[in-house]
């Protein structure tokens, strides 16, 4: 059996509670201190450095708190260069704030037109998937999203064809917004799965169970973790899925007609270079800093907890500082880009390098505790990811500083003993080839 359906998704605008605003403090020495609504202070710093030719040392961007962004702060919006331009020209401090109406004048989630074709056997097992998507962009810049690849990784299917094309329109360039690409692409895939369940007269939850896969077929690798089957089971139990009647207009809640449905989702966990610095003062208080931001995801709290756990300290004895471009490098703060993996290896050495009672005050050399499973422990020898400096034999200990830099781990070299990768995942439909379909969408 086959399902062939076309789905349209509309534009969506971020419109967070806090509108975009930039305050540029022009200092007497010509340097700029900028308070901006951004998900990446160092990204804004780099942008201004390239646009205005200013040295990075003369630009400091801060974003202590961000009142929501949803992706609209991943790149600088136009109020930032306007504020900097005015400040440099007037040689005085300037603030530019966008109105609520102006919040509709820049990036947005682009509209899409997607065609999903599914082929399955009588038991609902997927035999072929073809997902073709057409997205929009501006005429002066290409904006692409990961719209179709989710269809090749969420379910088990050996024959998959994916295509994505752009149509240049007289509009402003779109922008990443809350699970960019997946939020649009998964709508089409899951709607098509529901239509397949209806055509095959199979419960939509059971259909997804039958097509579950533990591997990402797009990359030929197993998932590091995937608890989707357990999620299916718990969700069905808690919502009473067994009481669902699949017939339309068959279920009521009081005087209202209701329907029960479900859908799956998938999202990527990206890792980028990140770094942090940890500092113990003479009172034993740990301060950890990184140039990441808090966009309402609780970064202040989470990073403080991670640092406290790694250092063996109380939460109230740890302070996490963020939102400053002068701090150690961190990636853009988004739902899939985190700096937490740099905080733990940074704070952990401090656990051994700073005795809880600061016995160095008495002029004695601290005794480093042995790491479990090792004969002895030497901070300089074992903390390969950290550059550590600490005082020795001093009656007035200087602060202890630990810095850590992490980057994503490269993929291991291919193993000769492993099975060869799957052949190119293609499926040729009898109606229209992928190439012809894409061209007709662009030029039709």
Give, region by region, the residue ranges found by the protein language model.
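Structural alpha/beta core scaffold segments of enzyme domains
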Residues: 1-444
């Amino acid at each position: 059996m086959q399902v062939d359906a076309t789905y349209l998704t509309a534009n969506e605008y971020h419109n967070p509670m806090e509108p975009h605003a930039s305050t540029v403090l022009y200092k007497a020495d010509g340097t700029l201190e900028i308070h901006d609504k951004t998900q990446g202070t160092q990204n804004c710093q780099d942008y201004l450095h390239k646009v205005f030719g200013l040295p990075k040392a003369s630009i400091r961007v801060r974003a202590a708190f961000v009142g929501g962004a949803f992706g609209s702060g991943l790149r600088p919006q136009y109020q930032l260069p306007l504020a900097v331009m005015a400040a440099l020209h007037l040689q005085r401090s300037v603030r530019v704030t966008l109105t609520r109406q102006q919040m509709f004048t820049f990036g947005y989630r682009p509209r899409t037109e997607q065609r999903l074709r599914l082929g399955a056997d009588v038991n609902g097992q997927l035999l072929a998937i073809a997902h073709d998507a057409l997205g929009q962009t501006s005429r002066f810049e290409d904006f692409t999203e990961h719209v179709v690849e989710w269809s090749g990784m969420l379910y088990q299917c050996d024959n998959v064809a994916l295509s994505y094309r752009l149509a240049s329109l007289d509009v402003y360039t779109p922008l990443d917004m809350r699970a960019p690409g997946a939020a649009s692409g998964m709508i089409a895939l899951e709607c098509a799965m529901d239509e397949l369940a209806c055509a095959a007269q199979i419960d939509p939850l059971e259909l997804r169970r039958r097509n579950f896969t533990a591997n990402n077929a797009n990359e030929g690798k197993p998932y590091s973790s995937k608890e989707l089957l357990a999620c299916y089971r718990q969700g069905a139990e808690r919502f009473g899925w067994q009481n669902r009647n699949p017939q339309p207009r068959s279920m009521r809640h009081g005087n209202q007609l209701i329907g029960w449905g479900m859908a799956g989702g998938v999202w990527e966990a990206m890792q980028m270079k990140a770094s942090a610095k940890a500092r113990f003062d003479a009172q034993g208080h740990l301060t950890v800093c990184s140039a990441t931001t808090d966009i309402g995801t609780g970064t202040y709290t989470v990073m403080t907890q991670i640092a406290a756990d790694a250092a063996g300290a109380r939460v109230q004895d740890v302070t996490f500082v963020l939102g400053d471009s002068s701090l150690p490098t961190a990636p853009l703060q988004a739902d899939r880009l985190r700096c937490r993996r740099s905080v733990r290896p940074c704070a952990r050495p401090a656990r051994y390098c700073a005795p809880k009672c600061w016995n160095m005050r008495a002029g004695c050399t601290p005794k480093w505790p042995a790491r479990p499973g090792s004969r002895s422990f030497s901070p300089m020898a074992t903390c390969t990811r950290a550059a550590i400096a600490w005082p020795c034999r001093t009656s007035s200990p200087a602060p202890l500083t630990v810095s850590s830099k992490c980057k994503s781990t490269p993929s291991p070299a291919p193993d000769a003993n492993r099975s060869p990768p799957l052949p190119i995942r293609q499926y040729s439909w009898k109606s229209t080839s992928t190439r012809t379909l894409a061209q007709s969408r662009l030029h039709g």
